[in-house]
């Protein structure tokens, strides 16, 4: 039995769920998300609770049972409170700023790095060294944060670059001089 799949999702008062054979549509105060329901798994809304059941006990269906439930839970949390990822910039002369809908970063290259803000995502720059990526779709928020981080990932010697908040960067010792 999938322990994740069999747990029930309690729906907040402001959330509305429509389930059909192929997809789950979840509406909340922050927006609307759609998540797929895979073959062998069905969803039912009963008394303000979202319950997932599976039709067989084969390994693939058991795995998809937990996956569908997790994706639905991410959507419910997304439309009620949203998701966010925080990034930090470390390095002399490295900084970020918003210019219209674009995130413009100086990352030690000969040119500025311009990152356009995708639809459904809000990018904020608190001071020049902190970037906050937020939105209702957890997968999209994580992907956009990873794309921003990939513009200058942290290096192991001084830790310069863009890293997630609370990310640990393994440091390496520099060269030891000639003796």
From Swiss-Prot:
Which SUPFAM superfamilies would you find in this protein's record?
Ribosomal protein L6
The alphabetized list of GO BP terms reads: cytoplasmic translation
List, alphabetically, the GO terms of the cellular component aspect. cytosolic large ribosomal subunit
Q: Name one GO molecular function term.
A: rRNA binding
Write the record's keywords in alphabetical order, separated by commas: Ribonucleoprotein, Ribosomal protein, RNA-binding, rRNA-binding
Look up the domain of life of the source.
Bacteria
Q: Does the keyword Ribosomal protein apply?
A: yes
Q: Name one Pfam family in it.
A: Ribosomal_L6
Annotated family: Belongs to the universal ribosomal protein uL6 family.
SUBUNIT field: Part of the 50S ribosomal subunit.
- PANTHER family associated with the record: 60S/50S RIBOSOMAL PROTEIN L6/L9 (PTHR11655), LARGE RIBOSOMAL SUBUNIT PROTEIN UL6M (PTHR11655:SF14)
Known role: This protein binds to the 23S rRNA, and is important in its secondary structure. It is located near the subunit interface in the base of the L7/L12 stalk, and near the tRNA binding site of the peptidyltransferase center.
Q: Specify the protein name.
A: Large ribosomal subunit protein uL6
Q: Which organism is it from?
A: Leptospira biflexa serovar Patoc (strain Patoc 1 / ATCC 23582 / Paris)
